[in-house]
UniProtKB/Swiss-Prot annotation:
ATP binds at residues 216-223. The gene is dnaB. It is found in: Plastid, Chloroplast. Belongs to the helicase family. DnaB subfamily. This is Probable replicative DNA helicase.
Amino acid sequence: MEKINLKTGRLIVEKYLPHNFLAEKIVLSSLLISSEAIETCLRSLTIDAFYFKNHREIYKAILIMYKKNTPIDIVTLNTFLQNQGLLPKIGGIKVLIELVNQLPNLVYLEEYIRIIQDKYVRRSLIKLGYEAINSGYITNISLEEILISLEKQMFSLTNEIKNQDVFSSVDLFSQILLELKYKSSKPVLAGLSSGFYDLDSLTQGFQKSDLIIIAGRPSMGKTAFCLNIATNIVKKYKLPILFFSLEMSKEQLAYRLLSAEALINPMRLRNGHLNKKDWLKLHRIIKNLSSLPFFIDDTPNLSIQAIRSKVKKLLFEQNTIGLVVIDYLQLMQSSTLKSSNRVQELSQITRSLKNIAREFNVPVIALSQLSRNVENRIIKRPILSDLRESGSIEQDADLVLMLYRDQYYNSNNENDEQLDITELILAKQRNGPIGTIQLKFDANYTKFFDYILKD
């Protein structure tokens, strides 16, 4: 039991603080049978949300194991707790066996989480009330400091309540109104700048939670273009970039990056045929690039689950991610669907990539090959239907960009001025116009530039 001594403001045990033992037990039980349940709890429940100490220890252990990509069931959890010397503190193996025997109904998981969250906020509110009473007796701290401290804690509690997936129209439109006021007061892009003026004008930048497909036939410059974009973003915003290179090694990608940034021919760079001026440029560029949060993963044949785990791990380490890049889509493996029908497998992959973009609130760029049918046409310029043999890319993508270099197919073109021109076709934009822009491509450095350079 708990009550307050009005003279001291101290808490005296008189009754239990709000909690729900069964809801906590069922939620923990769910975590032992479903990775989706862990993700749901990770978004909604802190360790302190659990009232019972042994429940907090179990939940903390599960989160640590999950972040390390350790399989989670009663055996692995028991082993982890034993190794940490925590098994006696949680009540022994019998507590874990009780959780396994609970047989939770996952359909109601979010409701059980809501109950736990509700009790946690109520406990926090009660404790804040006791703190307010105690603070009223303290005279060596200014009243202003006390009120500011209490206000901050109350604001934090309010945020706990509003941390929900369903928004009322009032909250939603109020949020949009604030965003619009900010944008109108400052001429900024709505999303991340690609570094290419005409592309930004059409798209208003890459938006959080967008799946962006950059497609083209081989040798159109997909990797170079995407690497240019990623470099532009990390240099401008200093946000972590995670680049999955499923085709090229990290060394090959690094050479391309250095060549494009230092404007040194990649063959000369690889051969080490560098003059003094080149070396000076190279040292300066390497120093600048080394200070940027640019992360490359060149693990081949990655599954969608592996990519998701690596994104989550980097987010946990860096606290934020600016952009995720996958080069390229057709080299990925499905986590669950093992089918001879590659189209179905690619459909599952693109849907999962869109889910990753939404879950982590980050733009995801995926490079994609186009159908070989392009080569059989007289006019080689790609169209949206060239993606349709690659699963549901067209349906799942928010933006579809296609690269076309006429020089590749018409090397004897008499119009020399057009030889370095690449068409960037914005074939789909879920929330904006489509169109075609022109870029300059310099094959000497595998780098793209604005067709008309902007100040």
